[in-house]
């Protein structure tokens, strides 16, 4: 008799995705981040659901409702900090996942990659809206500054911003709609992740060598299920250490002050995972130019498959490209640091140089280096 997991309509889908899925035998721990992102998403949906039971999306009570969750709700502090720091872990996994894709040439699976870029935008939008909800000083001013960027769009900018605000400033209408969108977006992200997986399973996974692994496949279960569980344990350990020992390490102290439209904080900055893009935005003196650079800094990922000039897929056997990749990583870390600094000398100059280098590396230096490596191989 055939096993039920191979015949039952629902079990069949699970079986072909997580049990009998043929996987390359040599994929490293860099391939763990997909499953870790799934765990992060589930954690965020669950903790978010419990937070939403106690949160009120009204400007008068939002801040005190978050305080109430932390002080009066059973383990409310734990749920709140798991949610806030879970977002940080989510972005760490996201950046690692994208970095893996860049290094090993996974972006040549075009459909999977483009849905991944769409997912990145969706997660960033969700995180931004979530940061507004506690209605602290940085929530309010972050929302004001970031939504105001849309006013740089010619002709329709001002009307668009007021339409998003639901008035003439960030107020009750803005908070209510941000809460509604923040609640629905994770489910849209989950659906997109399903499509992401669907396209991935059409082609099968890439592997560190970048070569075809059709001749050497192993079943996903038990090999990679066990491997993924190890990754999950490490993730849970790191998140637990963060939540239980220093839950406010990655937050902003200004957000413990209730929102006050009459008092601007000295340094308005987003959460750490947006600082690299914020630094690129600030490095351009022109408002529209800054907004375009900000959008393009993420959208540039969609161009990467077209900028692939190497005869090899992976960077595993390309030492010169590897150097440029790690230079890009260092550049992004520099941008992250600059984004959190005040706008003054020498940070302005460093930010401008790092921003130029970011676009130069991706658009010019990496494709040219790949061509040079091709000629060195006499191809």
From Swiss-Prot:
Gene3D superfamilies: Cytochrome Bc1 Complex, Chain C. One of its GO terms (molecular function) is metal ion binding. One of its GO terms (cellular component) is mitochondrial inner membrane. SUPFAM superfamilies: a domain/subunit of cytochrome bc1 complex (Ubiquinol-cytochrome c reductase), Transmembrane di-heme cytochromes. The keyword Iron applies. It is a multi-pass membrane protein. Its cofactor is heme b. The keyword Electron transport applies. Component of the ubiquinol-cytochrome c reductase complex (complex III or cytochrome b-c1 complex) that is part of the mitochondrial respiratory chain. The b-c1 complex mediates electron transfer from ubiquinol to cytochrome c. Contributes to the generation of a proton gradient across the mitochondrial membrane that is then used for ATP synthesis. The cytochrome bc1 complex contains 11 subunits: 3 respiratory subunits (MT-CYB, CYC1 and UQCRFS1), 2 core proteins (UQCRC1 and UQCRC2) and 6 low-molecular weight proteins (UQCRH/QCR6, UQCRB/QCR7, UQCRQ/QCR8, UQCR10/QCR9, UQCR11/QCR10 and a cleavage product of UQCRFS1). This cytochrome bc1 complex then forms a dimer. This is Cytochrome b. The gene is MT-CYB.
